[in-house]
């Protein structure tokens, strides 16, 4: 770098005109100007490098503020221009203005045009590379305006301790149009909002960075300069702007960052030893612009309205403090090998002279310590030492083939000492001639070693960062692996439990199949008994038909007798009373017989009521049994095979009940016929005075009724036996369920032990580098398995609810039917129909359960396959973890060997890379404006020629091409 020089920060003050709202409000214009560098506010003067009044044009502001910085940047200096002020004070108008309006454009578009114009007028031996970046600081986060996906960039420092934004997009440009297109693109992504004071209020600090690198193709001298163009967001008072919600949060962050900027300015102005650059990302980025290696110009924008007087004073005070800050600037130059060599030789000679001076002073000190008195003319003299240094430096510049002249020795030596020194000097110059080539080689070697050292340091730092990142990633993957192991083990345990339950269910299905076979045998026996009963019923039907015929014959004879008696009564009046008396007597006998029959019927009704009460009790017991059966069925819902056997048994019961219904219908018909026959027989017996025959008929009827009663009683007893059998079956099922619960508890204890064992084993796993994709696949498979099991459980639960609802509905209907009709045969029919409905519903439930069982059996192979696949994945994960550990140990052993190769690769990569992203460099040559389209990679030639090509194009003066 060149020699250092100090310069103050330049502060320019600009006042905007009163806006429409301020004029409508009647605000006063409070600014008074004294000359071109002073403004008076409330009788207090504020002096700056330049003060611009409200009528100043954009071009005049640019010429005074920024035009000189263009030359500085192209000569290798860093430059910064930023606008500061309250909201709606004209900062964005000053920095950007109307980008494509020749009169209204601000500093940024004008300075871009001037940079290229200045380049075109420079020496043709210079070659320029220009790249631009555009980012904003929004909510104290750095956001790339050229790539909106980069929303939180970080600030780092390069090897020279200069801050830069890491990862920010850098674009190479070769014409003003390309730069303006980049600005338009970034501006469209910037955050703006509407407030009470500004319709286009900037909600972020925007920074447009232009990086210019130039190289002299003849002297190989390289210069670089950076230009920061900053448009700060304005400070806000919430009471004036009316900010709410997100706009209020933005205002808080804006005021916070501007406060940090004010603290930095104050610390620099006061000469504080500590400057709080790190309080804000904005001050961190502008660290070199404030008190560092940069020529900085601050444009403070103020409002002349009395409404904003306090904010205007605060802005002016900020500018006055900033004006006192001094920056130390120097040219950013990259020395060539020859320049480094000359500098090395110069420093080496200075070091040699200093050694001689030290030796002289040590000799003089030793003489003083030994008690000698050194004369004044032999004592050390600084002027003589400087003369000696000048003489030595002058002699070094001579060519090596010229004879060396003796250097006068400082002090008054004896002749012998002087001759000795001259001989020694001659020898030294001869050695210098011999060592010139060695010095050149050493200087080149030093340059290479420095480059290698820097590369190694950078590589070591990047390797350490990569190692830390890999270690963090490894720890995270290890934690995820542990969690996935736990999940897989839990799922495996659940699958094992399902497999055990399935085996138990299969055993129970076999048991129930055997029970079903036994019940089938019993059903065959019952069918044989039912066949015998059918034969007896057939005999009864034949007897009834015979009695019907006999009763019909007796009725016909009785009608004939009654007709004859009627004729006799009608023809013989004397016999009419007798006939009447005989008829009355016969009716009396009939009434007596009927009254007897009524009494018998009443007794039968009482007996029927008793039977009904008994049947009601039995129904209640049946309901209780049905409730118990429902509870059993809820348990049986988990044991599908048991439900199958019970439903088959209920089908058999349904057949029996249907047969009983048919027999009851036949018996009821016979009972009606018998009652009619009884009436006929009574009339016949009364008419013919055959009481004995009537008694026999009555006894026969009573015998038939008694047989019917006994048959009904047998049916009731058989139903009771069946209920008792079902109760016994329910008790057995409860015992089996209790055993299963005990078995489940034992399995749970074993599960806890296995789980503890698995947890102890899982602690031994420490590292996992790969297999993330396989773990995700296993998780998806397990998720599908869980969904399948959940669906099956939900189906069983729905079936249980439907069964309970249907059973409750049937019980309710049965109670209503019993309360509505208490007749004998009708009540039996309703109960039989109720049982039929129950049986149909149970049949449907049974079929549904059979289908569900079949579906579960179909799903079982899939689940077993998934279980095996999961086990294989677990084994693969364990083997992969083991391999990862082995690979890690091998990698550590090969680390030293790999470092050397990585250094070479990184060094070549760094030489080829010119930024954070790979782009095509577009060199620019002075000579003439470009004529190529900005959409194609092109370069500029002096004389007006240009070339379009897919590769970077270099341009030289004179119109010649160079690809």
UniProtKB/Swiss-Prot annotation:
What topology in the membrane does the UniProt record assign?
Peripheral membrane protein
Q: Which spans of this chain does the record mark as coiled coil?
A: 329-914
Under the subunit heading, UniProt states: Oligomer composed of two heavy chains and two light chains. Interacts with GRIP1 and PPP1R42. Interacts with SYBU. Interacts with JAKMIP1. Interacts with PLEKHM2. Interacts with ECPAS. Interacts with ZFYVE27. Found in a complex with OGT, RHOT1, RHOT2 and TRAK1. Interacts with APP (via cytoplasmic domain).
Q: Which keywords does this chain's UniProt record carry?
A: Acetylation, ATP-binding, Coiled coil, Cytoplasm, Cytoskeleton, Isopeptide bond, Lysosome, Membrane, Methylation, Microtubule, Motor protein, Nucleotide-binding, Phosphoprotein, Ubl conjugation
Q: Which family does it belong to?
A: Belongs to the TRAFAC class myosin-kinesin ATPase superfamily. Kinesin family. Kinesin subfamily.
Renumbered to this chain, region (Globular) spans 915-963
Which parts of the sequence belong to the Kinesin motor domain?
A: 8-325
The chain's disulfide connectivity reads none
Q: Which organism is it from?
A: Homo sapiens (Human)
Q: Which SUPFAM superfamilies match?
A: P-loop containing nucleoside triphosphate hydrolases
Residues holding ATP: 85-92
**Where in the sequence is N-acetylalanine found?**
2
Write out the domain note.
Composed of three structural domains: a large globular N-terminal domain which is responsible for the motor activity of kinesin (it hydrolyzes ATP and binds microtubule), a central alpha-helical coiled coil domain that mediates the heavy chain dimerization; and a small globular C-terminal domain which interacts with other proteins (such as the kinesin light chains), vesicles and membranous organelles.
Gene3D superfamilies xref list: 6.10.250.1590, Kinesin motor domain
As stated in the Swiss-Prot or TrEMBL entry, residues carrying the post-translational modification Phosphoserine are 933
Q: Which GO terms describe its molecular function?
A: ATP binding; ATP hydrolysis activity; cadherin binding; identical protein binding; microtubule binding; microtubule motor activity; plus-end-directed microtubule motor activity; protein-containing complex binding
Q: Which CDD domains match?
A: Khc_CBD_cc, KISc_KHC_KIF5
Indicate what this protein is called per its UniProt record: Kinesin-1 heavy chain
Chain's role? Microtubule-dependent motor required for normal distribution of mitochondria and lysosomes. Can induce formation of neurite-like membrane protrusions in non-neuronal cells in a ZFYVE27-dependent manner. Regulates centrosome and nuclear positioning during mitotic entry. During the G2 phase of the cell cycle in a BICD2-dependent manner, antagonizes dynein function and drives the separation of nuclei and centrosomes. Required for anterograde axonal transportation of MAPK8IP3/JIP3 which is essential for MAPK8IP3/JIP3 function in axon elongation.
Name the segments for region: Disordered: 908-963
Whether Endoplasmic reticulum counts among this entry's keywords is no
In the record, biological process GO terms are:
anterograde axonal protein transport; anterograde dendritic transport of neurotransmitter receptor complex; anterograde neuronal dense core vesicle transport; axon guidance; cellular response to type II interferon; centrosome localization; cytoplasm organization; lysosome localization
